[in-house]
Amino acid sequence: MKIGQLIKERYEIVELLGEGGMAFVYKAKDMQLERMVAIKTLKPNYVEQTTFVERFKREAQTAANLNHPNIVQIFDWGIEEEPYFVMEYIEGNTLTSIISNRKTISLSDVLFIGAQVANGLQAAHSQGLVHRDIKPGNIMITPSGKVKVTDFGIVSIQDEESDITKTGSILGTASYISPEQAQGKAVSVGSDLYSLGTVLYELITGSPPFEADTPIATATKHLTEKPEKPSKYRQDLPRGIENAILKLLHKTPRDRFKSAEDLRAVLLQQRNQLEMVQTQESLVDLTNPKIKYKFTLPALIVSIGLVLGTFWTLSLSLIHI
């Protein structure tokens, strides 16, 4: 696709937003509804490969059926020079970009992001869908703080395995892949929760739980090694938050949270507790005599000055009378 090109006599390509392994994403204008949209199109070298075309079409169909505030909405699908689909245009950044641009993300923000991702995943899981590629690059944050899960291209439909998602296929991203995915085993709700656990781990510590020189070596670590406790890198981390993350990173799916909704509830509970502690500490500061003196002394001096100034002005006025 080219800048200025008109798709379906409706969508005008404005600019290239980015590209992934198999697709380009463009910003476009919907001429009928007078709004900006994003258009994802398959790269030309994949157009002749049936597996990738089916996977691309599958993403459009799957996401189109998920009408949820924490999932990017799909509006349209078609084939021009290449297959494409039209989706909601998000003003914001991926978590990958946010992580690279900020040294530390507040624990409250981490928990809020995690709760919103879990909310979106619950919507997918309730329809028998497993995302299979939860990672920072597939999570977007809007300027208002709303989280959007993207890229359902390798989604697995429970009880309906196709040739492109069947057991034995290793799909996912090495740093965030679940142990069962790394082995090519069947995926479940727990697989997405594990991947979300790796994302939360990275948001808190600055790095994924497992890293190595090659994707295969990284995936192997998910199978064979225990993650370091995140509190080793973030000493202010409350135990409840750490326990939740380590539970997500259990090697066996049954030892993780039972559902994304259960996880969401725990993350919000931990966030409320964290904010209560911060509020309590703030109230303690208000009762600290030293802090009180520090702020009230200048105010007292200013007040005395105003009184003396008023008195002096009044005195001069009386003299003139």
Language-model regions: role of each:
Residues 119-129:
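Protein kinase catalytic-loop region centered on the HRD/HxD motif
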Residues 77:
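Activation-segment/catalytic-loop signature of the eukaryotic protein kinase fold
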Residues 50, 143-186:
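Activation segment of protein kinases
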Residues 131, 173-274:
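C-terminal lobe helix-coil module of Hanks-type protein kinase domains
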